[in-house]
């Protein structure tokens, strides 16, 4: 993880803003630039005349940020400051005014009260003063109106503290920003992503990253109320994501976030109107990162948004030598394989005598698959361990693709190495039951929450990849995005017409009987 820091420090008075970039290389800290403000004091009222160098202006609209560098900051005409008067009471200023209308780096604030001490404390915050404790609200819902635009910084929770020093007839100070900032810079070479727009970004943590915070005299933020572990950044009509390299003008997205070390789940919400068989689809591409968010720092997080593609050539009859549409796959020169619904008059399906066809068994009883690709699958006992002890979690929104179309929905299971007691020899709750010899349906309700962020590497994902059905449905492609079906290596022992398969959908993971003539997924489990 690479962090590069740019400090904008004043030589006399001004605003401190640190920019931190996060990519994937080494680290470096460099480059100082100056900014300054001056402040004029009058007994019984105080006028703050904020002055900044034009190339490095101060304050609450953050702009001109570049990846790996800091940013420029200017005042808004709605900005106010808090100043502690001679009696130790916080006073809120009037809104900013600008001596030169076109120069937003220069602002004047007027504050009622008496100010004659050598120093006075100054606070900038988005929250009006209630009582004697300055607070800031880091918003759990933030809105960005255009790409690479951080006009909402002040409204979303930017804050700062300073000690105003009396110099002659003026008070001068350097404002230190005490919230942290994240800048998300996505790119993609994936066709489905490039056909989409980013409509919002969810940033989630295992600890609070938003809420109402008390601002200590040194600027330390302490959660007071309304803690939220998620920040949602909305992007209006959406940002394009058709850039293969980082292009901040396309989609750089900013949020204010509480300082501290956070392990984040960042879910980019995409709207795609071109690639789902049923019409527009809204779903997520998810990234994970752990960072230490330094107060006053902009952390650049780049991301290559990709979507897992499941090729479509691993649908099989149970224990068949070849896939359901062998030689005529959807992407072959002579495709028979339906990628959507097949017409009912079609006769293109696995026929007796072909490698894609499995004859019916002649008798019931225990039977394990003979083909190598089926022998590599979990047997019935192992699949029961995944169901009952694998902590299944439903994921409604993660996007995936197959056979030229975009879908969403699937389930997370713990990997075998993370399931205590995992064995291939017996039922997880009954050591005397071997499901290869005794048929038992096994089911468990799936959690509707995603797994814990810091434990995601213990899980693997199965998409709701549908199946090819027989009988009255006449070999149609069914339920993609709604249900997933995965073969085991074990036949059902109680009859000659069934085999064990995993079925997963929104609320349930189940090990149960399926017809061997159906085309279900064959894939090894982790």
Regions found by a protein language model. Give the residues of each.
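Sec-type signal peptide cleavage vicinity
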Residues: 2-388, 394-396, 400
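C-terminal, surface-exposed recognition/capping segments
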Residues: 400-526
